[in-house]
Amino acid sequence: MSAATSPSERRVSARIGAISESATLAVDAKAKALKAAGRPVIGFGAGEPDFPTPDYIVDAAVEACRNPKYHRYTPQRAPELKAAIAEKTLRDSGYEVDAGQILVTNGGKQAIYEAFAAILDPGDEVIVPAPYWTTYPESIRLAGGVPVEVVADETTGYRVSVEQLEAARTEKTKVVLFVSPSNPTGAVYSEADAEAIGRWAVEHGLWVMTDEI
């Protein structure tokens, strides 16, 4: 640590110091600043709906706030919420998940970080197909892992192959990130390709982290 480092900077952990600012939020902040200055701007940063939350959702939230049943905090979340998520997963995705296997978080970023924190040890590598959502590498670093990029371009429809993944695998590889549909490209893997990647991961004892946000 250099002598020029300020006291406030020295109080920040090495984990926090290793991550970068969100490029998405940086671009979004710049766009909003330009709009506030009267400049015409079309923002391609953070995705924010331009329509209000439907009334029935607002009404349900208000009713829940008024119901004493929901005034008590539970870190495991309400059993009926987990049951509803399990039911939706079966209905929409076609596979059955026990409610006891469901963890409710305050958003996708929390879920992704906690998942990496639960399975990564310092120095473990995570294969990350690129292009990717900017949160992934920083979540991996914050959890002590090392992101390893595998680039997929327009020639492959922005989809990585098993051969590419195998070329990136090392003794330190512990996780492969699999996102379909992809954010930001929108690429969708075929059933055959998804199965091939899954079989490859099982063969080498790797975790598969999926994000279907």
From Swiss-Prot:
UniProt: L-aspartate binding residues: 47, 133, 183
UniProt cross-references to CDD domains, sorted A to Z: AAT_like
Molecular function as annotated in GO: L-aspartate:2-oxoglutarate aminotransferase activity; pyridoxal phosphate binding
Top-level taxon of the source organism: Bacteria
Pfam families according to UniProt: Aminotran_1_2 (PF00155)
Enzyme kind, highest EC tier: transferase
GO BP of this protein: amino acid metabolic process; biosynthetic process
Coiled-coil residue windows: none
Required cofactor names: pyridoxal 5'-phosphate
Reactions this protein catalyses: L-aspartate + 2-oxoglutarate = oxaloacetate + L-glutamate
Family label: Belongs to the class-I pyridoxal-phosphate-dependent aminotransferase family.
Assembly and interaction partners: Homodimer.
Protein name: Probable aspartate aminotransferase
Native species: Streptomyces griseus
